[in-house]
Protein backbone atom coordinates (compact mmCIF):
# COMPACT_ATOMS: atom_id res chain seq x y z
CA UNK A 1 0.00 0.00 0.00
CA UNK A 2 1.36 3.45 -0.94
CA UNK A 3 2.12 5.77 1.95
CA UNK A 4 -0.71 8.28 2.60
CA UNK A 5 1.72 11.19 2.39
CA UNK A 6 2.33 10.31 -1.27
CA UNK A 7 -1.33 9.93 -2.25
CA UNK A 8 -3.38 12.40 -0.18
CA UNK A 9 -3.81 15.65 -2.19
CA UNK A 10 -2.74 17.94 0.69
CA UNK A 11 -0.10 15.65 2.19
CA UNK A 12 1.41 15.19 -1.26
CA UNK A 13 2.18 18.93 -1.51
CA UNK A 14 3.82 18.92 1.94
CA UNK A 15 5.69 15.72 1.09
CA UNK A 16 7.09 17.09 -2.16
CA UNK A 17 8.13 20.37 -0.53
CA UNK A 18 9.52 19.26 2.86
CA UNK A 19 9.96 15.48 3.07
CA UNK A 20 10.91 13.71 -0.16
CA UNK A 21 12.32 16.85 -1.80
CA UNK A 22 15.68 15.99 -3.43
CA UNK A 23 18.22 18.43 -1.98
CA UNK A 24 21.95 18.90 -2.73
CA UNK A 25 24.09 16.96 -0.25
CA UNK A 26 26.51 19.81 0.41
CA UNK A 27 24.41 22.91 1.20
CA UNK A 28 25.81 24.78 4.20
CA UNK A 29 24.17 26.65 7.08
CA UNK A 30 23.78 29.68 4.78
CA UNK A 31 20.84 27.76 3.29
CA UNK A 32 19.06 27.76 6.69
CA UNK A 33 17.83 31.33 6.39
CA UNK A 34 14.90 30.54 4.09
CA UNK A 35 13.28 28.32 6.71
CA UNK A 36 14.22 30.80 9.45
CA UNK A 37 12.38 33.53 7.54
CA UNK A 38 9.34 31.24 7.47
CA UNK A 39 9.59 30.80 11.25
CA UNK A 40 9.97 34.59 11.70
CA UNK A 41 6.88 35.23 9.57
CA UNK A 42 4.76 32.74 11.55
CA UNK A 43 6.03 34.20 14.83
CA UNK A 44 5.27 37.77 13.69
CA UNK A 45 1.75 36.85 12.51
CA UNK A 46 0.97 35.09 15.82
CA UNK A 47 2.38 37.78 18.14
CA UNK A 48 0.82 40.47 15.92
CA UNK A 49 -2.58 38.81 16.14
CA UNK A 50 -2.50 38.87 19.94
CA UNK A 51 -1.30 42.49 19.95
CA UNK A 52 -4.12 43.47 17.56
CA UNK A 53 -6.64 42.10 20.09
CA UNK A 54 -5.65 44.88 22.52
CA UNK A 55 -4.41 47.65 20.22
CA UNK A 56 -6.58 50.59 19.17
CA UNK A 57 -5.72 52.45 15.96
CA UNK A 58 -6.82 55.89 17.09
CA UNK A 59 -4.44 58.82 17.60
CA UNK A 60 -5.90 59.53 21.05
CA UNK A 61 -5.55 55.98 22.38
CA UNK A 62 -2.87 54.19 20.28
CA UNK A 63 0.07 55.09 22.55
CA UNK A 64 -1.81 54.28 25.76
CA UNK A 65 -3.13 51.00 24.30
CA UNK A 66 0.47 49.85 23.72
CA UNK A 67 1.33 50.91 27.30
CA UNK A 68 -1.77 49.01 28.48
CA UNK A 69 -0.57 45.87 26.62
CA UNK A 70 2.81 46.09 28.39
CA UNK A 71 1.42 46.83 31.86
CA UNK A 72 -2.00 45.22 32.21
CA UNK A 73 -2.31 42.36 29.71
CA UNK A 74 -1.10 38.94 30.86
CA UNK A 75 2.36 38.46 29.31
CA UNK A 76 1.59 41.46 27.08
CA UNK A 77 5.12 42.83 27.54
CA UNK A 78 6.72 39.63 26.21
CA UNK A 79 4.34 39.51 23.21
CA UNK A 80 5.06 43.16 22.40
CA UNK A 81 8.86 42.78 22.65
CA UNK A 82 8.85 39.47 20.77
CA UNK A 83 7.02 41.27 17.97
CA UNK A 84 9.34 44.32 17.98
CA UNK A 85 12.57 42.31 18.20
CA UNK A 86 11.14 39.59 15.95
CA UNK A 87 11.13 42.25 13.20
CA UNK A 88 14.85 42.79 13.80
CA UNK A 89 15.49 39.03 13.60
CA UNK A 90 13.40 38.94 10.41
CA UNK A 91 15.65 41.55 8.79
CA UNK A 92 18.87 39.91 10.02
CA UNK A 93 17.71 36.67 8.36
CA UNK A 94 16.63 38.60 5.23
CA UNK A 95 20.01 40.31 4.83
CA UNK A 96 21.83 36.99 5.36
CA UNK A 97 19.51 35.29 2.85
CA UNK A 98 20.06 37.98 0.19
CA UNK A 99 23.81 38.01 0.92
CA UNK A 100 23.93 34.24 0.42
CA UNK A 101 22.07 34.67 -2.88
CA UNK A 102 24.60 37.26 -4.08
CA UNK A 103 27.64 35.24 -2.98
CA UNK A 104 26.58 31.90 -4.44
CA UNK A 105 24.86 33.22 -7.57
CA UNK A 106 21.31 32.20 -6.63
CA UNK A 107 20.07 35.12 -8.75
CA UNK A 108 20.47 32.96 -11.87
CA UNK A 109 17.07 31.46 -10.93
CA UNK A 110 15.29 34.50 -12.36
CA UNK A 111 11.70 33.92 -11.20
CA UNK A 112 12.74 32.91 -7.67
CA UNK A 113 15.09 35.90 -7.40
CA UNK A 114 12.59 38.47 -8.71
CA UNK A 115 9.81 37.22 -6.40
CA UNK A 116 12.41 37.46 -3.61
CA UNK A 117 13.09 41.13 -4.42
CA UNK A 118 9.32 41.82 -4.40
CA UNK A 119 9.16 40.03 -1.03
CA UNK A 120 11.97 42.23 0.30
CA UNK A 121 10.06 45.38 -0.72
CA UNK A 122 6.84 44.03 0.83
CA UNK A 123 8.55 43.18 4.14
CA UNK A 124 10.13 46.65 4.24
CA UNK A 125 6.72 48.25 3.63
CA UNK A 126 5.18 46.12 6.39
CA UNK A 127 7.92 47.05 8.86
CA UNK A 128 7.56 50.74 8.01
CA UNK A 129 3.77 50.90 8.54
CA UNK A 130 4.17 48.76 11.68
CA UNK A 131 6.67 51.20 13.18
CA UNK A 132 4.06 53.98 12.93
CA UNK A 133 1.47 52.10 15.03
CA UNK A 134 2.75 52.74 18.62
CA UNK A 135 2.29 56.47 17.83
CA UNK A 136 5.43 57.62 19.62
CA UNK A 137 7.51 60.60 18.50
CA UNK A 138 9.68 58.58 16.11
CA UNK A 139 6.59 56.77 14.76
CA UNK A 140 4.90 60.06 13.88
CA UNK A 141 7.94 61.88 12.50
CA UNK A 142 9.22 58.79 10.67
CA UNK A 143 5.82 58.48 8.96
CA UNK A 144 5.81 62.20 8.12
CA UNK A 145 9.34 62.24 6.68
CA UNK A 146 9.17 58.98 4.69
CA UNK A 147 5.68 59.53 3.21
CA UNK A 148 6.74 63.09 2.34
CA UNK A 149 9.42 61.65 0.03
CA UNK A 150 6.65 60.77 -2.42
CA UNK A 151 6.04 64.49 -2.93
CA UNK A 152 9.30 64.48 -4.93
CA UNK A 153 7.46 62.64 -7.73
CA UNK A 154 6.85 65.25 -10.44
CA UNK A 155 3.32 66.56 -11.04
CA UNK A 156 1.35 64.02 -8.94
CA UNK A 157 3.62 64.00 -5.85
CA UNK A 158 1.69 66.35 -3.54
CA UNK A 159 -1.69 64.81 -4.39
CA UNK A 160 -0.26 61.33 -3.85
CA UNK A 161 1.07 62.21 -0.38
CA UNK A 162 -2.25 63.75 0.72
CA UNK A 163 -4.07 60.71 -0.66
CA UNK A 164 -1.88 58.37 1.42
CA UNK A 165 -2.27 60.59 4.50
CA UNK A 166 -6.04 60.85 4.10
CA UNK A 167 -5.78 64.57 4.85
CA UNK A 168 -3.26 67.41 4.97
CA UNK A 169 -0.99 65.82 7.58
CA UNK A 170 -0.26 62.49 9.26
CA UNK A 171 -3.32 62.05 11.49
CA UNK A 172 -6.07 59.64 12.56
CA UNK A 173 -6.89 58.55 8.99
CA UNK A 174 -3.20 57.74 8.36
CA UNK A 175 -2.86 55.67 11.53
CA UNK A 176 -6.06 53.70 10.82
CA UNK A 177 -5.06 52.82 7.26
CA UNK A 178 -1.50 51.95 8.30
CA UNK A 179 -2.95 49.50 10.84
CA UNK A 180 -5.09 47.98 8.07
CA UNK A 181 -2.02 47.69 5.79
CA UNK A 182 0.07 46.23 8.61
CA UNK A 183 -2.59 43.59 9.25
CA UNK A 184 -3.05 42.49 5.61
CA UNK A 185 0.54 42.67 4.30
CA UNK A 186 1.95 39.67 6.26
CA UNK A 187 -0.65 37.43 4.60
CA UNK A 188 0.39 38.79 1.20
CA UNK A 189 4.00 38.03 2.21
CA UNK A 190 2.97 34.45 3.11
CA UNK A 191 1.31 34.03 -0.32
CA UNK A 192 4.37 35.46 -2.10
CA UNK A 193 6.64 33.16 -0.06
CA UNK A 194 4.65 30.17 -1.36
CA UNK A 195 5.16 31.40 -4.95
CA UNK A 196 8.87 31.91 -4.11
CA UNK A 197 9.06 28.25 -2.97
CA UNK A 198 7.05 27.06 -5.97
CA UNK A 199 9.57 28.60 -8.39
CA UNK A 200 12.51 27.35 -6.31
CA UNK A 201 11.22 23.77 -6.43
CA UNK A 202 10.89 24.02 -10.22
CA UNK A 203 14.68 24.26 -10.51
CA UNK A 204 15.88 22.79 -7.22
CA UNK A 205 18.26 24.53 -4.84
CA UNK A 206 21.72 25.75 -5.82
CA UNK A 207 24.74 24.49 -3.82
CA UNK A 208 27.93 26.28 -2.65
CA UNK A 209 30.04 25.14 -5.62
CA UNK A 210 27.55 26.47 -8.18
CA UNK A 211 27.89 23.18 -10.08
CA UNK A 212 24.69 21.19 -10.88
CA UNK A 213 24.16 18.54 -8.19
CA UNK A 214 21.62 16.32 -9.98
CA UNK A 215 23.86 13.29 -9.51
CA UNK A 216 24.21 13.84 -5.77
CA UNK A 217 20.87 14.47 -4.04
CA UNK A 218 19.63 13.48 -0.58
CA UNK A 219 16.06 13.62 0.82
CA UNK A 220 15.19 16.85 2.64
CA UNK A 221 13.88 14.86 5.63
CA UNK A 222 15.56 13.95 8.00
CA UNK A 223 18.84 15.66 6.98
CA UNK A 224 17.76 19.24 6.43
CA UNK A 225 14.72 19.18 8.74
CA UNK A 226 17.11 18.47 11.64
CA UNK A 227 19.50 21.15 10.37
CA UNK A 228 16.61 23.65 10.12
CA UNK A 229 15.43 22.80 13.65
CA UNK A 230 18.94 23.56 14.96
CA UNK A 231 18.86 26.93 13.16
CA UNK A 232 15.40 27.59 14.56
CA UNK A 233 16.55 26.86 18.13
CA UNK A 234 19.49 29.27 17.73
CA UNK A 235 17.16 31.92 16.28
CA UNK A 236 14.69 31.58 19.18
CA UNK A 237 17.59 31.61 21.68
CA UNK A 238 19.00 34.84 20.22
CA UNK A 239 15.52 36.41 20.03
CA UNK A 240 14.67 35.52 23.63
CA UNK A 241 18.05 36.82 24.86
CA UNK A 242 17.15 40.14 23.23
CA UNK A 243 13.56 40.13 24.51
CA UNK A 244 14.39 39.17 28.10
CA UNK A 245 17.70 41.00 28.65
CA UNK A 246 17.73 43.99 26.27
CA UNK A 247 14.24 44.53 24.82
CA UNK A 248 14.90 48.18 23.92
CA UNK A 249 18.46 47.75 22.64
CA UNK A 250 17.44 48.12 18.98
CA UNK A 251 14.61 50.61 19.54
CA UNK A 252 14.61 54.40 19.80
CA UNK A 253 14.10 56.10 23.19
CA UNK A 254 12.11 58.86 21.42
CA UNK A 255 9.35 56.35 20.75
CA UNK A 256 8.53 56.28 24.48
CA UNK A 257 7.35 59.88 24.13
CA UNK A 258 3.79 60.19 22.75
CA UNK A 259 3.56 61.69 19.23
CA UNK A 260 3.58 65.48 19.24
CA UNK A 261 3.21 67.28 15.88
CA UNK A 262 4.47 70.53 17.48
CA UNK A 263 7.80 69.11 18.67
CA UNK A 264 10.31 67.68 16.18
CA UNK A 265 12.93 65.24 17.59
CA UNK A 266 16.55 66.42 17.05
CA UNK A 267 17.45 63.36 14.97
CA UNK A 268 14.72 61.65 12.95
CA UNK A 269 15.87 58.17 12.00
CA UNK A 270 14.16 54.88 11.10
CA UNK A 271 14.76 51.48 12.70
CA UNK A 272 18.32 50.09 12.34
CA UNK A 273 17.44 47.82 9.40
CA UNK A 274 16.54 50.82 7.19
CA UNK A 275 19.55 52.96 8.13
CA UNK A 276 21.71 51.89 5.14
CA UNK A 277 18.99 53.04 2.70
CA UNK A 278 18.36 56.18 4.78
CA UNK A 279 22.08 57.06 4.61
CA UNK A 280 21.98 56.71 0.79
CA UNK A 281 18.87 58.94 0.71
CA UNK A 282 20.56 61.63 2.83
CA UNK A 283 23.84 61.56 0.91
CA UNK A 284 22.20 63.29 -2.09
CA UNK A 285 21.32 66.98 -1.49
CA UNK A 286 18.47 66.88 -4.04
CA UNK A 287 15.08 65.50 -2.89
CA UNK A 288 14.11 63.62 -6.08
CA UNK A 289 17.70 62.40 -6.54
CA UNK A 290 17.73 61.08 -2.98
CA UNK A 291 14.43 59.23 -3.46
CA UNK A 292 15.69 57.68 -6.72
CA UNK A 293 18.94 56.60 -5.01
CA UNK A 294 16.93 55.14 -2.10
CA UNK A 295 14.72 53.04 -4.40
CA UNK A 296 17.68 52.11 -6.63
CA UNK A 297 19.67 50.81 -3.64
CA UNK A 298 17.16 47.94 -3.32
CA UNK A 299 15.92 47.74 -6.92
CA UNK A 300 19.52 47.21 -8.07
CA UNK A 301 19.13 43.59 -6.92
CA UNK A 302 16.89 42.94 -9.94
CA UNK A 303 19.87 43.79 -12.19
CA UNK A 304 22.15 41.17 -10.58
CA UNK A 305 21.50 38.47 -13.24
CA UNK A 306 22.33 41.01 -16.00
CA UNK A 307 25.52 42.11 -14.24
CA UNK A 308 26.82 38.53 -13.86
CA UNK A 309 29.74 38.29 -16.30
CA UNK A 310 31.61 35.38 -14.70
CA UNK A 311 31.66 31.94 -16.30
CA UNK A 312 31.27 30.48 -12.83
CA UNK A 313 28.04 30.77 -10.93
CA UNK A 314 29.29 30.88 -7.34
CA UNK A 315 32.03 33.05 -5.80
CA UNK A 316 33.46 29.98 -4.07
CA UNK A 317 36.41 29.72 -6.49
CA UNK A 318 36.72 33.46 -7.28
CA UNK A 319 38.95 35.12 -4.64
CA UNK A 320 38.88 38.64 -6.17
CA UNK A 321 35.08 38.66 -6.31
CA UNK A 322 35.04 37.39 -2.73
CA UNK A 323 37.15 40.37 -1.63
CA UNK A 324 34.75 42.74 -3.39
CA UNK A 325 31.75 41.03 -1.80
CA UNK A 326 33.14 41.50 1.71
CA UNK A 327 34.07 45.12 0.93
CA UNK A 328 30.40 45.57 -0.08
CA UNK A 329 29.29 44.07 3.27
CA UNK A 330 31.65 46.43 5.14
CA UNK A 331 30.31 49.33 3.06
CA UNK A 332 26.71 48.44 4.00
CA UNK A 333 27.68 48.30 7.69
CA UNK A 334 29.32 51.74 7.30
CA UNK A 335 26.13 53.09 5.68
CA UNK A 336 24.07 51.62 8.56
CA UNK A 337 26.30 53.44 11.06
CA UNK A 338 26.16 56.73 9.08
CA UNK A 339 22.34 56.54 8.82
CA UNK A 340 22.10 56.79 12.60
CA UNK A 341 24.47 59.79 12.88
CA UNK A 342 23.52 63.49 12.72
CA UNK A 343 23.87 65.34 9.39
CA UNK A 344 27.21 67.08 10.02
CA UNK A 345 30.90 66.84 9.12
CA UNK A 346 32.51 64.23 8.81
CA UNK A 347 29.42 61.98 8.58
CA UNK A 348 28.07 63.69 5.42
CA UNK A 349 31.21 63.03 3.36
CA UNK A 350 31.62 59.47 4.72
CA UNK A 351 27.99 58.75 3.77
CA UNK A 352 28.47 60.15 0.27
CA UNK A 353 31.65 58.13 -0.32
CA UNK A 354 30.03 54.95 1.05
CA UNK A 355 26.98 55.51 -1.19
CA UNK A 356 29.16 55.99 -4.30
CA UNK A 357 31.18 52.88 -3.38
CA UNK A 358 27.97 50.82 -2.94
CA UNK A 359 26.77 51.50 -6.50
CA UNK A 360 30.31 51.39 -7.92
CA UNK A 361 30.98 47.89 -6.53
CA UNK A 362 27.71 46.42 -7.81
CA UNK A 363 27.48 48.16 -11.19
CA UNK A 364 31.14 48.39 -12.23
CA UNK A 365 33.72 46.63 -10.07
CA UNK A 366 31.99 43.24 -9.73
CA UNK A 367 31.30 42.72 -13.48
CA UNK A 368 34.84 43.93 -14.39
CA UNK A 369 36.46 41.71 -11.75
CA UNK A 370 34.46 38.70 -12.99
CA UNK A 371 35.69 39.33 -16.55
CA UNK A 372 39.30 39.60 -15.33
CA UNK A 373 38.88 36.29 -13.43
CA UNK A 374 37.55 34.66 -16.61
CA UNK A 375 40.66 35.80 -18.50
CA UNK A 376 42.98 34.64 -15.71
CA UNK A 377 41.46 31.17 -16.06
CA UNK A 378 42.09 31.38 -19.85
CA UNK A 379 38.43 30.66 -20.56
From Swiss-Prot:
It is found in: Mitochondrion inner membrane. Component of the ubiquinol-cytochrome c reductase complex (complex III or cytochrome b-c1 complex) that is part of the mitochondrial respiratory chain. The b-c1 complex mediates electron transfer from ubiquinol to cytochrome c. Contributes to the generation of a proton gradient across the mitochondrial membrane that is then used for ATP synthesis. It comes from the Eukaryota. The chain crosses the membrane at residues 33-53, 77-98, 113-133, 178-198, 226-246, 288-308, 320-340, 347-367. Heme 1 (or BL or b562) is low-potential and absorbs at about 562 nm, and heme 2 (or BH or b566) is high-potential and absorbs at about 566 nm. InterPro entries: Cyt_b/b6_C, Cyt_b/b6_C_sf, Cyt_b/b6_N, Cytb/b6-like_sf, Cytochrome_b, Cytochrome_b_C_euk/bac, Cytochrome_b_N_euk/bac, Di-haem_cyt_TM. A ubiquinone binds at residue 201. Its cofactor is heme b. Pfam families: Cytochrom_B_C, Cytochrome_B. Heme b b562 binds at residues 83, 182. Belongs to the cytochrome b family. It is a multi-pass membrane protein. One of its GO terms (molecular function) is metal ion binding. The cytochrome bc1 complex contains 11 subunits: 3 respiratory subunits (MT-CYB, CYC1 and UQCRFS1), 2 core proteins (UQCRC1 and UQCRC2) and 6 low-molecular weight proteins (UQCRH/QCR6, UQCRB/QCR7, UQCRQ/QCR8, UQCR10/QCR9, UQCR11/QCR10 and a cleavage product of UQCRFS1). This cytochrome bc1 complex then forms a dimer. GO terms for cellular component: mitochondrial inner membrane; respiratory chain complex III. Binds 2 heme b groups non-covalently. Signal peptide: none annotated. Keywords: Electron transport, Heme, Iron, Membrane, Metal-binding, Mitochondrion, Mitochondrion inner membrane, Respiratory chain, Transmembrane, Transmembrane helix, Transport, Ubiquinone. One of its GO terms (biological process) is mitochondrial electron transport, ubiquinol to cytochrome c. This is Cytochrome b.
Amino acid sequence: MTNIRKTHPLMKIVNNAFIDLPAPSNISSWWNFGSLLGICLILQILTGLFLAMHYTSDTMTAFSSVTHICRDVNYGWIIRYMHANGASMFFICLFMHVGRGLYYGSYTFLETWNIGVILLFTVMATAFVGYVLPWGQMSFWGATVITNLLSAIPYIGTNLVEWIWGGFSVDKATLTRFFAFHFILPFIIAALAMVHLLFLHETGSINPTGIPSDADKIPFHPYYTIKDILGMLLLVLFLMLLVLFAPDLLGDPDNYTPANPLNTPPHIKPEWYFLFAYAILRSIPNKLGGVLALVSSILILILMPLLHTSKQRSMMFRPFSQCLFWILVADLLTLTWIGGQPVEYPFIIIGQLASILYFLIILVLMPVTSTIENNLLKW
